């Protein structure tokens, strides 16, 4: 039996590696990703990433894969407060590893991409039009 903490760590690593990896493949310079249909490619791949991560970890940890899910379940009284901190630590560390692996696998592409938004886009989201009054 695998520890639920290890399962959350591995699942979140898979989720971020596959999800961020496809965004990097589509957005960065000189990759083989399809630039013609990025929205379909990215959304389908993220859906697949969630499916794979949940399938791999669901039996062992419930496949929260996100601190917001864990906190929401605790607030709803459907998950133990005692396990929450361990789950969140495992998820954050897994997300860090998945993001780092994406960077390592695409390091040459990150270095050759001059568009800062394309580089940032594989790791986070931001408004397309920055307007602090409307964005917050």
Question: Whereabouts are the PLM-identified features?
Answer:
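Membrane-interface helix-loop junctions and terminal tails of multi-pass membrane proteins
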Residues: 1-136
């Amino acid at each position: 039996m695998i520890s639920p903490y290890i399962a959350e760590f591995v699942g979140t690593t898979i989720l971020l590696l596959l999800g961020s990896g496809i965004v990097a493949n589509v957005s960065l310079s000189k990759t083989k990703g399809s630039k013609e249909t990025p929205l379909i490619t990215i959304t389908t791949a993220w859906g697949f990433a969630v499916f794979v991560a949940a399938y791999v970890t669901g039996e062992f940890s419930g496949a929260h894969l996100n601190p917001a899910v864990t906190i929401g379940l605790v607030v709803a009284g459907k998950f133990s407060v005692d396990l929450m901190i361990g789950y969140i630590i495992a998820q954050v560390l897994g997300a860090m590893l998945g993001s780092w692996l994406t960077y390592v696998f695409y390091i040459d592409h990150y270095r050759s991409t001059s568009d800062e938004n394309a580089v940032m886009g594989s790791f986070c989201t931001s408004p397309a039009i920055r307007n602090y009054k409307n964005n917050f």
